[in-house]
């Protein structure tokens, strides 16, 4: 087989536990962007 390394493990592995909430992306103030529509309405109160 050309251009393929033999005996190397696969780079992507889905084994193990899923990501935990403590690793979830958050803003600096600790909030998560779960309701963008609500945030947009707060930013534009005249509409």
From Swiss-Prot:
Basic and acidic residues biased stretches: 12-22
Organism: Halalkalibacterium halodurans (strain ATCC BAA-125 / DSM 18197 / FERM 7344 / JCM 9153 / C-125)
GO biological process: asexual sporulation; sporulation resulting in formation of a cellular spore
Keyword Calcium: no
Gene: sspK
Identification of the protein by name: Small, acid-soluble spore protein K
Source domain of life: Bacteria
One GO CC term, this protein: endospore-forming forespore
Lineage: Bacteria, Bacillati, Bacillota, Bacilli, Bacillales
Similarity annotation: Belongs to the SspK family.
Record field: transmembrane: none
